[in-house]
Amino acid sequence: MKKVIALVLLVALVISLVACSTAPASPTSSAAKDTKDQLYIEVSALGNLDYFYDHKLGMKKVGEDLGVKTEYVGPAEYDMNAMVAAFEQAIAKKPNGIVVVGFEDSLNPVVKKAQDAGIPVVTVDADLPASGRIAFVGTGNKNAGIMGGEKLAQLIGTKGKVAIMTKPGQSNLEERVAGYKEALKKYPDIEIVQIVDTKSDPVVAAQAAATLLQKYPDLAGIACVEAAGGSGAATAVKEAKLQGKVQIIAMDRGNDVVQAIEDGVISASVAQQTALMPYYATQILYNLANSKVDITTDNKAAGVQGIPAVVDTGVIIVDKTNAKYFMRQAK
């Protein structure tokens, strides 16, 4: 009888231990309830460009993975006044954090306004270091330009005339242009003949590239540091029937660029891992709200935020060897 009682007690003890060990995994835990209503918003412009599909994808994915609400807002065109208005509307929603593409310094005041209201802001893609933002997540832009410059130099046999297509005034693009210049200056037989404004518009870029080809009939290469440039340059080179004669280095991995690589019109593209930018920016904001790392005995008193200040999401060279893996499926 004593053995039976002992066995019953042992079984009861095992059951209670198992129940205790599995309890924290319950989906109805207080942590899950606390975060499911949290809201994180990305504010951008140029939402009509294929490039920003990956921004939207990154925000959607991080929301699903963290179990929080996410939104992507902002104008379809390059309109800073409309973007500021979208940012103001985002502040009014009192989100747990805001992710913003730092196109221009004109965004600094509204970023500071959010910070002053207790809403932390992380910049992505292009930085606003004077805005008071808590972190930047994006490409090491100068290094991206250096990689593109080295690739272009090899494609043209380290000699010849080249042009660079950009949108002046954006800090991230200026850094890429600086990277191209640094890479190409190592080759004395390469001359940068002109830097052209695309206005981040594929149609304008195509017209600008066509003018370049007429002005410099011996042009060896075109370097593009933003998404519209590659598409426009490809259109102009194809219409002039100069595929293979004028080497194009594009930027990023829109389907039109990837197809042009497979068709032999664009030689290669420097592709950012764009979806990682809003993904990790939101992760930083989420951690700031929910899971602080004790860097010191008192982070707040010590002036320590306990988050990375800069995250480099890196770039990948896309060419004929790997282009097929970058083609997006139908949205």
Regions found by a protein language model. Give the residues of each.
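Extracytoplasmic "Venus flytrap"
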Residues: D37-L66, E71-V84, V101-D105, M165-E175, ...
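Short beta-strand elements in bilobed, periplasmic/extracellular small-molecule ligand-binding domains
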Residues: E64-E77, K161-T166, K181-P202
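Flexible loop/hinge segments that line or gate small-molecule binding clefts
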Residues: E104-N143, M147, Q154, K161, ...
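Hinge/cleft segment of the Venus flytrap/periplasmic-binding protein
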Residues: K33-K36, A183-L184, Y280, I284-K331
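Hydrophobic alpha-helical segments within soluble ligand-binding/sensing domains
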Residues: M83, V137-V162, E174-E175, V204-A206, ...
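Hydrophobic alpha-helical
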Residues: E88-A92, N96-Q115, Y180, T198-A260
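Short, solvent-exposed amphipathic alpha-helices that sit
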Residues: Y51-L66, A144-G148, N172-I190, A208, ...
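Short, low-complexity disordered leader/linker segments with a strong preference
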Residues: M1-L39, E64-D65, K112-I119, K324-Y325, ...
